[in-house]
């Protein structure tokens, strides 16, 4: 986006992410490793000047797979223990699977079990619990509704505006504090 800037953090892999997500990303990858899975970061920040950069230009999105994956095939990657662990646990660290399976018509992208996006812990847990994409969450926060065929029935009982975005630099041990009235402000 024009005028969007962020403090960059270069990972050991050479990829860049927004400094604000680094601690949560590190905590997630350390937990993944402790669970016995080896991983490789396959992508991160891409300048908005680069064609096809999309949300990578925010520094909030990155790709990660099992260590020995050569080709990003969703059918293969989604079955790898590393990516299964990441998909099941990423929300605890503030991340979502950005393009989940079965939501292609909503996201406009094929299933990508390696593509993760930071949204904050509260939003990530809410979205994952309620089977929501970022697009569906945005719709709910802005007063719209989503199909119960694509979201769990819990969405009707939960107020998404009660979800608060926390400081993305906070560690997982830190107390979550609201930094904004709108939980999507962190995404802009």
Enumerate the language-model features and the residues they cover.
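Extracytoplasmic cell-surface/polysaccharide-interacting catalytic and binding patches
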Residues: 1-159, 163-164, 174-188
